[in-house]
Amino acid sequence: MDKELTVVIPSYNMERFLPKCLESFGMDQLRKEDGTLADALEVIVVNDGSADRTSEVAHQFEGRFPTVVKVIDKANGNYGSCVNVALRGATGRYIRILDADDYFETGECAKYLRFLISLHGAADLVVNDYDEVGASGRTSSVVRYGLPSDAVFPMGLLADGNEMLDIHGIAYRREMLVRMGYRQSEGILYTDAEWHSLPMSQVATVAYRPGVLTHYLVGREGQSMERDRFVGNVGMLEQIAKRLVRDFDGCPTSGPEDGRRYARKRILALLRLIYTMVLLGYMGVRAKFDLLGFDTWLKNNSRTFYDEMESSIVIGRCPFHYVTEWRRRRSDRTWRFRLARLALNMRTFLAAK
């Protein structure tokens, strides 16, 4: 049977988490229920030069499930290099990424595979719900997209809506990625922003299966979004943002219009995040990021994105357009900025209670 789904698992020093991740596919259960269904799944574990037993653990599962699990051992090259090497060897009709410290809802795996098979490749993008869990396994939040689930629908619905899809809730038709020559940046962090932005420009049709499929682990020590690590590596986020702008503007007519509208919206969201973090003092990023240099680069390289780069925060009942204010004054030390930071800190405090 041809592979319907390839799941790529980038793994660096993940011996503690990888067994739970791989067991979550319920491969024994799939074989008992429907042997052909197990054969529709391909799992590629990419060991990114780990110094622990990650490779050994992965090869143990490969020995148990040789028709499903494939292990690639490679020198360390960070997240994007794992995705790139897996893409070259993947055979599934659809492909998705699962971090080694995340895991599937085992009871949903078979249903999800059957859903993919039923599509016969009609959707370029397949969306699922996911939740965020802490180290104890307790769910902290659930992301339900609430999209139409009775039929494949056009990408325009997402382009016109407010949904911001994340890596935990998407699978792409692999042939689409091959056709566009998709390749992720290597040697840096935060390349998941590329995964849920650039391929979207090629999407014309979407399918949605409601129900939590993926459990996303948050709050683990050593994660790339951990405060101190994020602040120290924020320059990598700048590299990602520049690559997204260059690649998107470099192919102005490539892809369906609705796909490009959604991709543009996703890139704008990242740009706005950068300006917000710096100007409103989020996570201490302000001292580590040359926003003036980045803003000048954006103005010189993409006037369209530059002109659309506006964000505001409501102080009292009045919106404060802080990007415009900063560009006009070239300062973020005015009383309005002090009020904006206070308002943001209060909202963050209240949200955490």
Language model features with spans:
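Short, well-formed alpha-helical segments that are part of the catalytic scaffolds
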Residues: 14-35
